[in-house]
């Protein structure tokens, strides 16, 4: 999940609970999310318009970037596709902040999707969730934290809210707040 905000400190964030934390953490009001676009296009069958929603999301991001607006967007980091976009935003003077909302296991992500489906949201097959989970963690530390101006990893598994795991600036780790969780992330990407 990836996001951008504030003209003087353009930002880029990442994962689950984004709706509640983004405005508060970043002062960011514009949140571009393909899932929400799909719900707007086809509320009863958002899966049927997923490709169109993804295209509209990318177009909206390009529009906001060319207008110099602050914004955030969501991604699982499962692909390399946003690396060039991050570099483009930085070239335009954006300060990119990555917020990664981590779940300790792919099974927890599968449970979250099942809950979302029970509440009327769209489904994602378990094998796709597992693949995106592994790729997202690997890309987090190999591709995205090294290029983001500021990054924070949060544990998003607790019922009482998110908890900071670590934070840094580009490829420099400034503080590991939760060494056990951070080690799980590092070890997972090696497996």
Which residue stretches match the model-derived regions?
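A glycine- and Lys/Arg-enriched "phosphate-lid" helix/loop adjacent to the NTP-binding pocket
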Residues: 94-140
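Single conserved hydrophobic/aromatic residue that forms the stacking wall/gate
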Residues: 1-10, 14
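Conserved substrate/cofactor phosphate-moiety recognition/catalytic segment
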Residues: 19-69
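Conserved nucleotide-binding/hydrolysis micro-motifs of P-loop NTPases
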Residues: 24, 36-38, 78-79, 102-108, ...
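Flexible, glycine- and charge-enriched loops at secondary-structure boundaries
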Residues: 3, 47-51, 75, 126-129
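NTP-dependent small-molecule kinase module
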Residues: 142-191
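Glycine-rich phosphate-binding loop used to anchor ATP phosphates in small-molecule kinases
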Residues: 52-103, 136
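Conserved beta-strand scaffold positions in the cores of enzyme catalytic domains, especially
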Residues: 31, 98, 151-153
């Amino acid at each position: 999940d990836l996001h951008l905000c504030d003209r003087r400190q353009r930002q880029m964030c990442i994962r689950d609970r984004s709706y509640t934390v983004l405005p508060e953490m970043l002062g960011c009001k514009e949140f571009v999310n393909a899932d929400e676009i799909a719900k707007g296009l086809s509320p009863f069958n958002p899966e049927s318009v997923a490709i169109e929603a993804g295209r509209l999301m990318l177009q909206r991001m390009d529009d906001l970037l060319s207008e110099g607006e602050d914004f955030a967007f969501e991604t699982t980091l499962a692909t390399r596709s946003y690396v060039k976009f991050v570099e483009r935003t930085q070239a335009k003077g954006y300060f990119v902040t990555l917020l990664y909302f981590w779940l300790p296991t792919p099974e927890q992500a599968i449970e979250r999707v099942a809950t979302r489906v029970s509440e009327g949201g769209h489904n994602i097959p378990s094998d796709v969730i597992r693949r995106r989970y592994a790729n997202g963690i690997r890309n987090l530390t190999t591709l995205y934290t090294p290029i983001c101006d500021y990054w924070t990893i949060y544990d998003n598994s607790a019922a009482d809210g998110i908890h900071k795991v670590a934070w840094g600036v580009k490829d420099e780790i400034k503080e590991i707040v939760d060494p056990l969780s951070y080690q799980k992330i590092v070890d997972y990407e090696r497996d």
